[in-house]
């Protein structure tokens, strides 16, 4: 059994066959799926999916950096209203910084991220962090809260050894590793074993995006997280079971509420 710690199974891409996708995930050995939000609409959709799959699908709440606009304050006021015990959120996410396409809302992204970092400190819910082209700014911000944060995941890590070491200085955090690991030109099979202990990794799909080899180019789904697990085992020179055990333990450490029942 292993866990897909980051999957957008609430998306419209799965509207026609979500039940089959869930069944294939279980069949592949996926014991739980964790669903990050990106905005208010997706938060509603995620809660619906998680109510349909209790004990299997677990929700997060957060405003994705690419969804941050000038009205971010009003949006976060509305989103925070969802942070009630009956919604059983396991994390604040997916939140962070994304300057890949544009820095138009650079300051707004930083401010919205910091506000949601404060939610994490207040609620003791871990962070699911999305960061593209903004690691320096992210690290600078997180350092101010390092001693107060409960922990979290640096989702979709694709960086180099130096970047990995910098992130691992946040000792309650782990790296989320997905389909990029399996790509032909990926440097992760060398980078990760060099500097990242296996117990500092969780596995993810980011479905419906970033499908791993041999499914690259297709719609990604949670069942395919097994290909990430297998490639990690090859890279570290250990068994698939050893990777499952280590990444499950990391997931349990970071997301205790998903294992509370």
Indicate residue ranges for each PLM-predicted region.
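Mid-domain alpha/beta scaffold segments of enzyme catalytic cores
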Residues: 1-261
């Amino acid at each position: 059994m292993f866990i897909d710690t980051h999957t957008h199974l609430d998306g419209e891409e799965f509207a026609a066959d979500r039940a089959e996708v869930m069944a294939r995930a279980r069949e592949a050995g996926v014991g739980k799926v964790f669903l990050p939000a990106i905005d208010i609409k997706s938060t509603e959709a995620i809660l619906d999916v998680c109510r349909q799959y209790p004990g299997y699908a677990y929700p997060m709440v957060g405003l994705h950096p690419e969804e941050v606009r000038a009205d971010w304050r009003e949006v976060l006021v509305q989103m925070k209203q969802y942070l009630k015990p009956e919604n059983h959120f396991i994390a604040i996410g997916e939140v962070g910084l994304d300057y890949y396409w544009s820095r138009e809302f650079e300051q707004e992204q930083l401010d919205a991220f910091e506000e949601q970092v404060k939610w994490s400190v207040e609620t003791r819910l871990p962070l699911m962090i999305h960061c593209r082209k903004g690691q320096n700014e992210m690290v600078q911000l997180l350092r101010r809260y390092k001693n107060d944060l409960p922990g979290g995941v640096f989702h979709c890590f694709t960086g180099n050894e130096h970047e990995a070491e910098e992130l691992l200085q946040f000792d309650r955090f782990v790296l989320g590793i997905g389909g990029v690991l399996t790509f032909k030109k990926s440097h992760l099979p060398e980078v990760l074993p060099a500097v990242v202990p296996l117990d500092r990794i969780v596995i993810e799909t980011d479905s419906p995006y970033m499908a791993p080899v041999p499914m690259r180019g297709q719609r990604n789904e949670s069942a395919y997280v097994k290909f990430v697990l297998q490639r990690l085992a090859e890279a570290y020179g250990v068994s698939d079971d050893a990777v499952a055990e280590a990444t499950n333990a990391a997931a349990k450490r970071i997301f205790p509420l998903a294992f509370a029942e």
